[in-house]
Amino acid sequence: MRIHPFQGLVPVPALAPEVACVPYDVVNTAEAAALAAGRPHSLLHVDRAEIGLPPATDPYSDAVYSRARANFDSLQRGGTLVRETGPCLYVYQQRMGDHVQRGLVAGCHVEDYDAELIKKHEKTRKDKEDDRTRLIDTLSADTGPVS
């Protein structure tokens, strides 16, 4: 498997707690809206952009992806998300109770994924994969640690 550093977009440290959010697929639209209420810097406005549209909006409609792009651009223009000065590898740590796990975020080669050298995230659903792929294509960025 081949990995490489990449020049990511990161929140400015003072706003990082406001940008951070739960994974898009652990909350429904109403829960995402409640979590993002009063938090204009929350990445939920990108990952679950339907929360800023009328309630009857299809979460897979063009309007949602357009809104996600507009919100993502706004976070960059407003200085909430800034580009790293050079390529980086990102180490992270997650804790739940006594369990701690660490990971690495890096660029990789699609060919390695296609050759099954990269383990696929467990229990993925085709509709969710298609949604995240469309969001990544729309943003020209991946806003989640697992894709």
Predicted regions and their residues:
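A cross-family signal for N-terminal binding/gating loops and helix N-caps
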Residues: 1-147
